[in-house]
Amino acid sequence: MFLVRRIFKVKKGTARQAADIITQIGKMYEQAGLRTSSRVYISGSTVPGPSDTVYMDWIEESLKSAYRKDNPTPAKEDELFGILEDQYQEETSVEFYEIYSV
């Protein structure tokens, strides 16, 4: 099993608003049956850590290409990512971890 963590660096002071959109994105993938439930969390406001940063993580049984032919696109994917990218996101990256114990 793998933990996948996506990191979003967002515009100053917009972490909570961006986290709302990112939460919707996670639920969209979960409802489409494409992903397990995700957690969304922030750092840098009331806790130490990089400022204006939102994280989303979830667990995958195996790592697969997001561009594979059998990977459907959820209905609101373009809309939600469009809002995120236009209004909040400055950059994003993805980290992968192999789960050792649960």
Predicted ranges, named:
Residues 41-46:
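Short, solvent-exposed loop/turn elements at beta->coil junctions and helix N-caps
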Residues 96-102:
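Short, low-order "capping/linker" segments at domain edges
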Residues 1-2, 35:
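General helical secondary-structure elements
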Residues 24-39, 50, 58-95:
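An amphipathic, aromatic/His-enriched active-site/gating alpha helix that lines ligand/cofactor pockets
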